[in-house]
């Protein structure tokens, strides 16, 4: 597969890193770890000033500050990786595979992905390989491939050529968690996306969420 792969992880998450390395080495996929941001170490005002999130992002009566900071840390991790990749020489022609460090890949991941890639419509910004709460009502565009409607989760996805530029220019500052704002852009036809159906990636049940159970 002619793709570039990064795994977003955080300092001290050795069990997750061993888990991801075992999977990807077993599948023969070269990858790099990307140092993510732990929300507890971020400052709300700085996130607003840097236009990562809006002030309204933190006006959430359902969730406390620790959860909102964890969501912001997740968003910042993805944003910084997109920025890094967009500045590189391969961003114009090589898809970018981004995995979070609890991604559980299908045993036939490489075979299935190699079948999907030629079917992805030209101009697609994001291919969701894992997702939640998706209706799967989108148009079938190829074997195992549908147009996305309103997918959530950033556990595992591919960004197509120029997709990082569109995400960076249209998504920030966020008013909601990053997966919600991405889904909103897709729903409004401001971002072109497809989903793998069925999924190639799910979140591993062996690790608890670092969003809903953030650590210091």
PLM segments and residue spans:
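An acidic/histidine-cluster motif and surrounding catalytic segment
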Residues: 1-99, 103-216
């Amino acid at each position: 597969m002619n793709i570039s792969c990064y795994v977003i992880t955080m300092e001290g998450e050795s069990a997750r890193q061993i888990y991801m390395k075992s999977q990807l080495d077993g599948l023969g996929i070269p990858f790099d770890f990307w140092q993510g941001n732990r929300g507890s170490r971020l400052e709300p005002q700085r996130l607003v000033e840097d236009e990562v999130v809006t002030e309204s992002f933190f006006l959430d009566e359902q969730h406390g500050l620790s959860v909102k900071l964890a969501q912001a840390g997740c968003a910042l991790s993805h944003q910084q990786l997109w920025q890094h990749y967009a500045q590189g020489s391969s961003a114009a022609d090589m898809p970018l595979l981004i995995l979070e460090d609890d991604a559980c890949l299908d045993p036939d991941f490489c075979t299935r992905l190699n079948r999907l890639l030629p079917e992805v419509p030209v101009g697609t910004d994001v291919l969701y390989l894992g997702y939640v709460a998706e209706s799967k009502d989108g148009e079938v565009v190829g074997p195992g491939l549908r147009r996305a409607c309103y997918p959530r989760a950033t556990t595992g996805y591919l960004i197509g050529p120029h997709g990082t530029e569109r995400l960076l220019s249209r998504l920030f500052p966020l008013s909601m968690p990053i997966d919600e704002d991405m889904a909103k852009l897709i729903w409004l036809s401001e971002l072109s996306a497809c989903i793998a159906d069925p999924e190639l990636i799910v979140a591993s049940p062996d690790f608890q969420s670092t969003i809903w159970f953030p650590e210091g």
